[in-house]
């Protein structure tokens, strides 16, 4: 299944009106053996493999990793978006400030329904914003294989790949903190859609690695110091129950009989008083991931006494990244900057 097909169907099984369209023809070569292009970071930046050997819990894929460009029906901010598919060898790419350095670092999780990665719209373009602010930005190209049970990845027994990659990357950032001029106590996460869910997942699954420790990086804490889930999915009980019915492996989501399905938290996101501070953003007209995902997470965080700031907007839909339009929601990066000052991560 291509990125375009997936996103047109809707990450949560709901028809999508604002997401990536049909796959463009990326090669004039008609041979069946022709290779599709692969994503590479901008000059001067290198993808760093996060596992020294094979990644744990490997999943089958239909072919090699490849990149695709969105069709004309999905040009957020007037530009196409780039997706990366069939990722089996996860990497992270570090973008460091050249001048002023606050010591803050953000690990970025692009969205894509755990089946593809919106690598520019919800990845590298975050770094275009953060690096000039003196913040180190690390884009995680986590595993998405487009096969197997749904979700294709996440903190579920069926396929914990993305959370394993997130835990590993967080440990690597702290291990190399001095080398990369990062304060190890100021490392947060920011993710979109499924990447927003992954932000919440690592913020509630950090006490123990999901994999056998590999080296010194896995002795470092993988708890984020702050989290920024942007239009996140999979966070309400209703969303978790929908997830449980997908794919070939069905499973039961344990919950109280009288639980509010829309506003109760997904049991796979066990919020505690130690969950890091959160900034949440979502739109009322998000037809991909319901606004109740943010509301359910907000309520759970408040009940646990975790500092949380939430912004809800009437319009804006889903998958807009940082691309500015006339809609007020697209000014959200300024709100995050203010919030980072509020929680003491950066100074005025």
Enumerate the language-model features and the residues they cover.
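N-terminal cap/lid segment of alpha/beta-hydrolase-fold proteins
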Residues: 36-99
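Mobile cap/lid helix-loop segments that gate and shape the active-site cleft of serine hydrolases
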Residues: 68-79, 213-220, 224-270, 276
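Short beta-strand element of the alpha/beta-hydrolase
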Residues: 103-111
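Catalytic nucleophile-loop/oxyanion-hole region of alpha/beta-hydrolase
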Residues: 118-119, 123-126, 140-184, 326-330
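Primarily recognizes the serine-hydrolase "nucleophile elbow" in alpha/beta-hydrolase
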Residues: 164, 168-243, 262
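Short beta-strand/loop motif that positions the catalytic acidic residue
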Residues: 280-282
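Conserved alpha/beta-hydrolase "acid-adjacent" motif
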Residues: 287-293
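Catalytic histidine neighborhood in serine/cysteine hydrolases
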Residues: 302-319
């Amino acid at each position: 299944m291509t990125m375009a097909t997936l996103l047109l169907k809707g990450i949560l099984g709901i028809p999508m009106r604002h997401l990536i369209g049909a796959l463009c023809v990326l090669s004039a070569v008609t041979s069946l053996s022709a290779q599709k292009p692969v994503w590479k970071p901008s000059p001067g930046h290198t993808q760093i493999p996060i596992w020294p050997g094979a990644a744990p819990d490997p999943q089958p894929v239909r072919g090699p990793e490849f990149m695709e460009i969105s069709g004309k029906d999905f040009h957020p901010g007037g530009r196409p978006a780039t997706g990366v598919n069939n990722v089996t060898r996860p990497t992270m790419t570090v973008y460091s400030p050249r001048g002023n350095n606050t010591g803050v670092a953000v690990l970025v999780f692009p969205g894509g329904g755990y089946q593809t990665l919106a690598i520019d719209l919800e990845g590298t373009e975050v770094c275009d914003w953060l690096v000039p602010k003196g913040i180190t930005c690390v884009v995680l190209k986590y595993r998405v294989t487009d096969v197997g049970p749904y979700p294709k990845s996440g903190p579920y027994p069926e396929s914990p790949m993305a959370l394993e990659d997130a835990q590993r990357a967080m440990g690597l950032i702290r291990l190399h903190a001095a080398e990369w001029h990062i304060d190890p106590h100021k490392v947060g996460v920011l993710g979109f859609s499924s990447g927003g869910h992954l932000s919440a997942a690592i913020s509630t699954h950090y006490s123990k690695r999901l994999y056998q420790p590999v080296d010194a990086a896995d002795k470092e804490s993988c708890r984020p110091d702050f989290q920024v889930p942007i239009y996140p999915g999979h966070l309400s009980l209703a969303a978790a129950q929908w997830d449980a019915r997908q794919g070939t492996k069905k499973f039961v989501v344990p919950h109280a009989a009288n639980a509010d399905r829309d506003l109760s938290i997904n049991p796979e996101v066990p919020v505690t008083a130690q969950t890091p501070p959160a900034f949440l953003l979502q739109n009322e007209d998000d037809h991909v991931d319901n606004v109740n995902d943010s509301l359910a997470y907000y309520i759970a965080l408040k009940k646990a006494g975790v500092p949380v700031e939430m912004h809800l907007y009437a319009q804006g839909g889903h998958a807009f990244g940082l691309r500015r339009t006339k809609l007020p929601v697209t000014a959200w990066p300024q709100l995050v900057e203010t919030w980072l000052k509020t929680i003491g991560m950066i100074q005025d």
